[in-house]
């Protein structure tokens, strides 16, 4: 894993025995995944939010955070758009400018959740056009908590850039059947 700043630990080593022909081993898996991670690029942002946002029951609520607008370089391989500014002001809206048409846009984010027992939480991504009109929603997560919990949920989704959403925006929303606390902690955005 030359030049990787992400350490791969174990990766199933306890549960994966060498197969008969010795072509797939835990060490080989670590090497392959390490190589994949080395070639992932993107801009990683962390929020400076001090506490959770209260999400009222049965109310779709936009997640907000005081984001540091300087992207952190995830690996040594930086994508072509690395100097673009994807967060504007304090409105926590990801700007979809500077993306080439038909590019594959991947998005990874973390949301801290504090929920009571017997709670369903939905997380969705809303993509709007340059006029601020909704073009589509992506139902990213539908979680059911049988018992009260405080945890960080990491989610991934992707879409393809199209002229309908050129210079548009992306926002993250949370909805729950009970009042919860939600904190948008970080996001990673990349395009190929």
Model regions and ranges:
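Extracellular jelly-roll beta-sandwich "head" domains, especially the C-terminal globular C1q domain
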Residues: 24-30, 38-192
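Extracellular "spike/adhesin" assembly and maturation modules
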Residues: 1-40
